[in-house]
Amino acid sequence: MPITYGGKIKSVEDATRVVRLGIEKISINSGVFENPQLISEISNELGSSSTVISVNVKYNKFKEKFIVFSNAGKRATGYEAVEWIEKCIQLGAGEILLTDINREGTWLGMNQKFVELAQRVTEIPIILAGGTSSYAEAASILNHDFVSGLGLGNLVSFHKKDSGVLINYPKEGIIKD
């Protein structure tokens, strides 16, 4: 399984330095809003398969759209999710990590509208994250052809909601290849 690094990547030099440490993929988020060409630059240097764009979204009930946020979910970018993802693909992104930050860590289950959003982006691999409530839900989401992976945090780090840390692994056969 390839290891992906994300955080404070502001230049091709930053990305190259991390890859030289043995990391296969670079995930960028906030840096691309300051310099969208960073996607192309990293993709040209390291390859699109090593260029992961982390897209953090919040659902806007009034606009009935997912809006993209940067800076750990603190800053609205003005982009609607599909518009931003399409731009990232055009610039050379090879993979999208799409996170519903309203659901992240809540155990409420993934927002169905969020899953439908992912279905609209099928040109490159997409990993979904944010609110998975159970292994059964994870397996169900992974059955969609358009989902290449899931980001699971609390589900594999806690025994149950509001409980202490207890790393746990799904039993064999719960989530199939």
List each language-model region with its residue ranges.
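C-terminal helical cap(s) of enzyme catalytic domains, especially alpha/beta-barrels
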Residues: L38-E45, A138-D177
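Conserved anion-binding
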Residues: V19, I23-L98, N102-R103
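Short secondary-structure boundary/capping elements
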Residues: G6-K10, E34, A76-E80, W107-M110, ...
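Alpha-helix-loop-beta-strand connector modules within alpha/beta enzyme cores
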Residues: M1-T4, S40-N56, L108-S134, I174-D177
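Catalytic cores of alpha/beta
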Residues: P2-Y5, I9-I26, K113-L150
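Short, well-ordered secondary-structure micro-motifs
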Residues: T16, L38-S40, K63-I67, W107-G109, ...
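A cross-domain feature marking catalytic cores of carbohydrate-active enzymes
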Residues: Y5-I9, S30, V55-V57, D100, ...
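Short gly/pro/ser/thr-enriched loop/turn and capping motifs at secondary-structure boundaries
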Residues: F33-E34, N60, S134, V156-H159
